[in-house]
Design a protein with these regions (language model features):
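Membrane-embedded architecture of ER/inner-membrane glycosylation machinery
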Residues: 2-4, 9, 178, 296-492
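Membrane-integral, polyisoprenol-dependent glycosyltransferases
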Residues: 1-366, 386-387, 461
Length: 495
């Protein structure tokens, strides 16, 4: 470990912070909440703030037992801040901030870990920024970090916890590992027992392959640490069980945890290899380097079986254990959703950075991987140049004019321009044998995030959510007393 309170470390984290604010915070409240689930989260949190009942999440008096309360508490806290009607007129900043901040803090933790514990071949400035951007620019992270549900917050709290566990095992100081266990408690308060299961699997996989596993286990202080996790996470479950009894037990533990894992819920049935497919999408456009990073980490693990390898040099092996834990656990699950892969993306980002660091630009593997990657980028560019063939297949009853609006708004043209420029730059940097090609392309993707994603979000909001907000405003103007509004397909709603 490099124990530095150096200007270089602070500068690196400041750069990562600025990038994170651009990706996760910028224009966070410019659009309304989309779909059914995020508004329900927001409504439950707002009800907590207004009623003062911070124990049981409810929407219009109806219990919501699907998730633990941390996401509601954080949303409710932001809803309780003064002058919210000025700085959050749509109420979407308050609803989305927990997800955004969870991803932002995890991004900083990834950068700091890669800076303070450089692995073999790492560049102390390049690797932390590239690794953290690899996480933040994942298509799934970009989407869920701006969505008012609990998945990104789980990824943030669990990811920080797992990195802190490894940092403790890699460190020679006498830290009691309190923070790691505390964040694990927060993760359990975000999504439930699944957080504890994933953390246990990751650490168990890692310890099994370590020769001095007993000393490493003692380092993370499991007896006192587990007590900290229990003190943070368990009291709410006990209080909720005492208040609501059997309905809470059956709904939360029975349906939303056990039944979701053992049987298909809401028609979300997918084949066992589903997350191998999601892994490809989640790591675009650098997916080939993820698989190479996995190969390199596995090779280093096999090498460590023959030669002694210190824990400070084992971050990539630990990341492989982390990714494997998520992959195995959710592949066995009967119910499968793309969001289940989010907790593995921090590990995937670290493995992608491992791939770039381990390759030299004269290496044949490097050449083959980049040629494959350029073909992927070229394919994406061509998809937009021939968009007329697939735009007509878009059939969304809630946005019937979406295809024509994508063209008339200029978004399709911008996508053609951006991805063709991106592909061309990748080819130029490849032939110039640039050492920092990954970082340059990531920065261009960062620009593209604002150039493309922001207009797309605003177009979707204008087409889908703005009409609903206009109707809601009209209803508030003509409503008499506490009349109830009935909407087809939804429960009774008080506006």
């Amino acid at each position: 470990m490099i124990l530095l309170n150096s200007k270089k470390r602070l500068a690196t984290l400041l750069i990562v912070l600025i990038f994170g604010i651009i990706i996760f915070i910028l224009d966070l409240g410019a659009t309304g909440l989309v779909d059914e689930t995020p508004p329900l989260f927001a409504a439950a949190a707002r009800a907590m703030s207004e009623s003062g009942d911070w124990l049981t999440p409810k929407v219009n008096g109806i219990f919501r037992f699907d998730k633990p309360p941390l996401i509601y508490w954080l949303m409710g806290f932001f809803y309780s801040l003064p002058k919210i009607e000025i700085w959050d007129s749509l109420g979407t900043i308050s609803a989305r901030l927990p997800s955004s901040l969870g991803s932002l803090f995890l991004m900083l933790m990834i950068a700091d870990t890669l800076f303070c514990w450089p692995q073999k071949g790492d560049k102390q400035f390049f690797t932390p920024i590239a690794g953290s951007l690899g996480f933040a620019l994942s298509p799934l992270i970009i989407i869920w970090s701006r969505t008012a549900v609990s998945d990104a917050l789980l990824t943030g709290t669990l990811g920080i916890s797992l990195l802190l566990f490894w940092r403790r095992m890699a460190s020679e100081n006498n830290d009691k590992c309190i923070a790691a266990w505390a964040f694990l408690g927060f993760a359990i308060l975000t999504k439930g027992p699944v957080a504890f299961v994933l953390a246990t699997l990751t650490i168990t996989f890692f310890l099994i392959i370590q020769k001095d596993w007993r000393s490493l286990l003692n380092k993370i202080n499991p007896k006192k640490g587990f007590l900290i996790t229990i003190l943070i996470s368990v009291p709410w479950y006990v209080l909720e069980l005492l208040r609501e009894g059997r309905p809470f037990w059956d709904n939360f533990f029975g349906y939303h945890n056990f039944q979701r894992y053992t049987s298909v819920v809401n028609n979300h049935s997918e084949p066992i290899w589903f997350f191998l497919y999601i892994m490809i999408l989640a790591s675009l456009p650098f997916t080939p380097f993820l698989y190479h990073g996995i190969f390199i980490a596995f090779r280093e693990f096999l090498k460590s079986l023959k030669e002694s390898c210190g824990v400070p040099d084992s971050l990539y092996t630990y990341s492989l254990c982390w990714l494997s834990a998520v992959l195995i656990f959710f592949s066995i699950s009967a119910t499968k959703l793309p969001s289940y892969w989010l907790p593995a993306i921090p590990a995937a980002a670290i493995l992608i950075s491992n791939s770039f660091i381990s390759l030299k630009n004269t290496n044949k593997t490097y050449v083959y991987l980049w040629i494959f990657n350029i073909f992927i980028l070229f394919g994406v560019s061509m998809a937009f140049f021939f968009s007329n063939y697939w735009l007509s297949s878009i059939n969304d009853p809630e946005m019937p004019n979406l295809a024509s609006e994508l063209i008339s708004s200029g978004i399709i043209f911008k996508a053609k321009l951006f991805f063709s420029s991106f592909t061309l730059l990748a080819i130029i940097l490849f032939f110039l044998k640039s050492r920092n090609i990954l970082l340059y392309l990531q920065i261009l993707l960062l620009v593209g995030q604002s150039y493309l994603m922001s207009p797309i979000r605003k177009l979707a909001d204008t087409s889908r959510q703005l009409p609903l907000r206009n109707i809601s405003k009209l209803i508030l103007d003509i409503r008499e007393g506490r009349e109830t509004l009935a909407m087809i397909g939804l429960s009774l709603i008080h506006i």
